[in-house]
């Protein structure tokens, strides 16, 4: 689960950048 956190954080950052 911990290994997924960086991936999720990157996805959120990408979405924030897109918006």
From Swiss-Prot:
Chain positions found as Leucine amide: 19
Highest taxon of the lineage: Eukaryota
Modification comment: Phylloseptin-2.1TR is amidated, whereas Phylloseptin-2.2TR is the name given to the non-amidated form.
Localization terms from the record: Secreted
Coiled coil: none
GO cellular component, one term: extracellular region
Keywords: Amidation, Amphibian defense peptide, Antibiotic, Antimicrobial, Cytolysis, Fungicide, Hemolysis, Immunity, Innate immunity, Secreted
Tissue spec. comment: Expressed by the skin glands.
GO biological process: defense response to bacterium; defense response to fungus; innate immune response; killing of cells of another organism
Family statement: Belongs to the frog skin active peptide (FSAP) family. Phylloseptin subfamily.
The protein, known as: Phylloseptin-2.1TR
Lineage, top ranks: Eukaryota, Metazoa, Chordata, Craniata, Vertebrata
């Amino acid at each position: 689960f911990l290994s997924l956190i960086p991936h999720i954080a990157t996805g959120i950052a990408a979405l924030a950048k897109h918006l």
